[in-house]
Structures are given as C-alpha cells and as structure tokens.
Amino acid sequence: MKKEKAPLGLYIHIPFCRQKCAYCDFYSLPSREDKMDAYTDALIRHIREVAPRTESHRVDTVYFGGGTPSYLGAERLRSILRAVMKGCPVTRDAEITLEANPDSACDIKALRTLRRAGFNRLSLGVQSADDGLLRAIGRIHTFAQVQQSVTAARKAGFRNISMDLIYGLPGQTMQQWEDTLSAVIALAPEHISCYGLKLEPGTPLYERRLEETFPDDDAQADMYLYAVTALEQNGYGQYEISNFAKPGYESRHNLKYWRMQEYAGFGPGAHSDFGGVRYAYVRDLDGYIGGRLILSESESDATLARDYEYVMLSLRTAEGIDRRYFETTYRQRFQPMEELLVQYEQAGLACRTENGWRLTPRGFLVSNSIIVALEDALAQQKLRREQAVASGNYRVI
C-alpha cells in the first residue's frame, strides 16, 4: 500500500481577461473564443498527464486564478474541474476557488452551474467601492455590480466569498479607503484581502507614475493600520500580512504557499512546488496549447534555501516562526535571530508567541527589512559554522 502524503493543492491558471488593468503584470491576454476552446482542451490534457502523480496525495484545495477565470465561461470551467475530480483524489471537503470580476459574476444561472460543478469559494476582484478610482486603474466594473454579484452568488449557493481590495491608488484619500472598507464589510464576505498598490515596471500605471499623485508611504501605512483595526472590530481576524477572515474561512489554498506545502500548477506562467522540485511554465499560450510544456525555471530541494524561505514566509503570517520547528528541521540555532527579535519587540514590531515569534501589524509594515536582517543573522551563523568546520573546531551544540 502506498503511504499517503500531505494534502496537495492545485493551481489552474486561466490567462484570459476582458481588459488588462493598469497595474497588472500577471500573465493575461484578451479573451478569444477560439483560443479559449483550445486552451480548455490543453488544460484537460495536461491535468490528465499529471493526475497519476497525485494518487498518493489528497487534493484538498483547487484554485482557478488568472487573468479572469470567470471569463472562460461556466461550461468550460465545469469541464476543467470535472477532469480534475475524475483524475485526482479530490477530498469531499476540498476548497475549490474561482477568481472572478464582479461584472462577470452577476449571472445567477452561470453561478449555479459553477456551484453544482463543485466550486464553493468565489474570490471577487473588487479593489475599491469608488467608481472614479476603479476607472482610474482600468477596472471595468462598478461597485453596484459588486453588490449584484454578491446577491447572485448567495442565491446560487456560495457560502464562502472573498474580496480583494487595493489601497494606495492614484489620488486615493483616507476617507475613500474608509468608505470602501465600510461598504465591503456591509456586504459580509467571509474573507477580505487588502493589498498595497505595487507599481510594476511595464504596466500602464508604472508608465504614468510621474503624472499621477499617489498616497505617500506614511499615508499608505495609515491606510493599512486602519484596515487592520476596522476589520478586526468587525470579526475578521488577520492571519497573514494582507489577509483577513471570519473564523474558519482562511484561504486554505494560500496557506499552502505560506506553510511551504506542496502544490501543482497548470497553465502558462503557473508555478509548482511538487515532488521535491519547484518549477514554472513559460508564459506562452500558443506553445501551451500546442503541448509544449517548457519550464521557465526549475530548482530541486537540494538547491533551495528552505531555511531562509521558512523565515520569510512564516513571518508573513499571524502564526509566525516556531522556534523548535526551525531548529529541529533546519539544524540551525535560533538564538542569533532571537537576539534581533528582542530588539524588534522593544520597538513594538514583534511579539512572542507560545512557540516562538510573530510580527505585529506595525512590524508587518516593515517586514521586508526585518526579514532581511534576520536572514543576514542566519547567514552569518552559517558562515561561522563553515569556518569552524574548516578549522576543525566545530562541534554540535
């Protein structure tokens, strides 16, 4: 009998969009019926090829991301999910998420088709409740459509709805951000993500960065801290830097990334960490449709710095770093990092947990700097150990 491995997550990339947003650098292309049919066939073929490798796992999360998966249409999405369920050991309680734009999620009939097919979590790209701000960043929906999509989704049977918001938008005021949070909270989604705007090179918003007026760093910090307080006061616990959920509605799929669990990706640009190898497919729709599954990157466990990665990812979460787990798993002393964490604790940026350390909301704001400092302390410890081994003075502590 094969030994059952830890549960596996599946990520399925749908690269089609009605219109690319001004800030987006994800791999996405204009929607075309002929391409969508061919792509659906290619995905199903790829899923069938990989399915035998999942037999010793339980697949407990499936995530359709993009792009805008909802533009693929309910029937195509249903056929892809059917291939997943037929070929992979998907658990009865699996979390199956579909990303959607509000303008494409107002059709109750289509939503019912998706719900009956097995989708049970809907993630809506809301971004703002201010229609003027939505137009400024190239979004094609209105907040009225957000409200309509929530009503339709509830009627279709969705009991788990997530909404993405962005702060730091061009010209955005604190009042607009507060109003957005109030409007979204009133819709009672189970999960809310709040992301600071990132100006990615090559995007229209990046090219216009000198023409636009953006909230400065202090203003964005105030927006973030306001969101943390407002959401927690309304029953949304913060479980990761940008993510908040009602109890029991944390994104199980995204937790796999932060907990360094295995996931397999399908589609051009999709990433995987599966079978001891991390890899990604090239961003080439036509090549993928033609069956050319070319990797853009690939690393084995032997070359990955998992200890550094654990520090980086765990400090993104409310769980934080588990001291004993770190020392036993990576055979590294925690003390050099703990000395720094004590200093961060005194500054109000970190706090102790039952098993180790986590960052505070203010610590999350400067998490990149903190993580770099901790990883540098870890690197210095490794260097000292290597020097001790070379000199013959090393002993296990």
Where are these regions (language model features)?
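A short, conserved structural fragment
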Residues: 345-355
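Local cysteine-cluster metal-coordination motifs and their immediate loop/turn environment
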Residues: 15-26
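Short, amphipathic alpha-helical interaction segments positioned at domain boundaries
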Residues: 364-397
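C-terminal scaffold of the Radical SAM
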Residues: 5-9, 28-53, 57-332, 392-397
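Minor-groove-contacting beta-hairpin "wing" of winged helix-turn-helix DNA-binding domains
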Residues: 356-360
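Conserved N-terminal Rossmann-fold NAD(P)-binding element of oxidoreductases
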Residues: 12
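Short amphipathic alpha-helical interaction segments
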Residues: 331-343
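Flexible, acidic/Gly-rich N-terminal and inter-domain linker regions that tether
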Residues: 1-8, 18, 45, 347, ...
